[in-house]
């Protein structure tokens, strides 16, 4: 019964993640949803900037702290190995949903174009960024990344093995294609508001700092010389720079 409960929990966590991920596309793109990055009542500039920074900061702290090996080794003693990743995914998704809900719009225009060719090109780049994100998860192990593999192995009584390091397809061009996809999607828009600009700047800064200061170090410790060799051959974010 406990294993079945963990499976149900993992499926719920993945479903919430999927909803949060799909909503992110509409939220940043300002379409299909009633609450997007530029919708809602515009309030005091200073207070809006502070609230938005706190929302992004909450997500950043949760997302980074819970991903660190030291935290995970303690956390699995509480939630169990099988549901650790699902819990991380669920809490990250809830932090995002809170951000969507409480985000304060700042609609001052930074840039805007009505040139049809430019508009279509920017929407194409926007979609391309999200496609990179999705495809990059498949090039490692999408189901392990979001906790489904762990709950399946627990249900079947399979000993979980650490994933083997591999650098195929997009990972042969940059070391962090998922993050590159997010950055592209966050910046590609035919209409950049002040709120959208702040979102893009702060998320880009977070991605660069989190990857350089934490993720890369954790990967070096976990993988060792093979990852060091990979670092020498493949750039972090910008293709063809090595």
Please state what every model-predicted region is:
Residues 23-26, 46, 55, 132, ...:
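Hydrophobic transmembrane alpha-helices
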Residues 148-162:
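Juxtamembrane inter-helical linkers in multi-pass membrane proteins
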Residues 43-57, 118-137:
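Alpha-helical transmembrane segments
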Residues 30-42, 72-76, 104-115:
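Membrane-interface helix termini and inter-helical loops of multi-pass transporters
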Residues 1-14, 85:
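Alpha-helical transmembrane segments and their helix-start/interface "positive-inside/aromatic belt" motifs
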Residues 14-33:
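Alpha-helical transmembrane segments of multi-pass membrane proteins
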Residues 39-47, 74-91, 156-160:
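Juxtamembrane helix-capping/reentrant segments at transmembrane boundaries
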Residues 61-78:
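Membrane-helix interface/capping segments
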């Amino acid at each position: 019964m406990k294993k079945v409960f963990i499976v149900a929990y993992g499926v719920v966590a993945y479903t919430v993640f999927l909803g949060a991920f799909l909503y992110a596309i509409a939220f940043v793109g300002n379409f299909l949803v009633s609450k997007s990055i530029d919708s809602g009542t515009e309030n005091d500039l200073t207070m809006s900037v502070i609230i938005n920074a706190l929302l992004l900061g909450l997500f950043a702290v949760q997302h980074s702290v819970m991903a660190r090996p030291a935290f995970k080794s303690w956390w699995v003693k509480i939630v169990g190995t099988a549901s650790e990743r699902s819990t991380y995914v669920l809490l990250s998704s809830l932090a995002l949903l809170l951000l969507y809900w409480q985000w304060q719009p700042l609609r001052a225009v930074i840039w805007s174009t009505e040139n049809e060719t430019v508009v279509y090109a920017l929407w194409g780049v926007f979609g391309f960024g999200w496609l990179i994100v999705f495809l990059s998860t498949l090039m490692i192990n999408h189901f392990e990344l979001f906790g489904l593999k762990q709950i399946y192995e627990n249900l079947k009584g399979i000993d979980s093995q650490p994933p083997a390091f591999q650098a195929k397809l997009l990972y042969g061009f940059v070391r962090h294609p998922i993050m590159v996809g997010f950055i592209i999607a966050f910046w590609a828009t035919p209409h950049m508001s002040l709120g959208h600009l702040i979102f893009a700047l702060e998320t880009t800064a977070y991605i660069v700092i989190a990857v350089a200061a934490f993720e890369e170090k954790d990967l070096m410790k976990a993988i060792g010389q093979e990852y060091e060799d990979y670092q020498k051959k493949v750039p972090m974010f910008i293709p063809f720079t090595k």
